[in-house]
Design a protein with these regions (language model features):
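Non-catalytic, solvent-exposed segments at the cell envelope interface
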Residues: 1-178
Length: 178
């Protein structure tokens, strides 16, 4: 991360800056780049902020919807998920800082492969899946298997399952259904 490229909103009041010193805010980006490990480019289809109270260690999460129109740099307003594709984490963090009056310096970026590896390292995740969701997961599982070289099985019907990484990532990608 090139800190010289990170912008902050200079109009933040001294009072707000004082309050912000008691907190750490971490930007979290989930990329839909299908390049299996290349975290330097791609649209950030997931943008979340983790705000940590340094005294109490309380964590609050906020999601910034990917279709939110923000100034992504140089006065250009477009869907905020374009900032990461346009200028990497520096541009995406700058966009959040300038538009939301923040001073973010830390971030985490994941892609499909990162999610798959994390879930597999944890031994899977227990989920109750509906018949509709099992059907919708099929195409995503096929695509993720091709991208990653995995051989995860499709779910033929609903039920309670311990999903492996590919299956969990496929489930997370469902955008519609009953």
């Amino acid at each position: 991360l090139d800190m010289d490229k990170i912008e902050v909103n200079e109009d933040i009041s001294q009072e707000s800056r004082k309050i912000m010193k008691g907190y750490q805010t971490i930007a979290m980006f989930g990329l839909d780049n299908r390049s299996n490990g290349n975290l330097s480019q791609g649209r950030s289809d997931v943008i979340m902020l983790a705000n940590i109270n340094n005294d109490t260690k309380e964590v609050k999460l906020v999601s910034v919807y990917r279709d939110t129109y923000l100034d992504t740099g140089d006065g250009i307003f477009q869907k905020c998920n374009a900032a990461y594709a346009k200028g990497g984490p520096e541009q995406a963090i700058s966009m959040l800082n300038v538009n939301l009056d923040l001073n973010i310096t830390d971030y985490v970026t994941v892609d499909f492969n990162s999610i798959i590896e994390c879930v597999d390292l944890l031994g899977g995740v227990d989920m109750e899946i509906t018949d509709d969701e099992a059907s919708l997961m099929t195409g995503y599982i096929r695509e993720l298997n091709e991208l990653t070289g995995n051989k995860a099985e499709n779910l033929t019907q609903g039920g309670t399952y311990t999903l492996n990484g590919v299956q969990a990532c496929a489930y997370a990608r469902i955008r519609y259904g009953g």
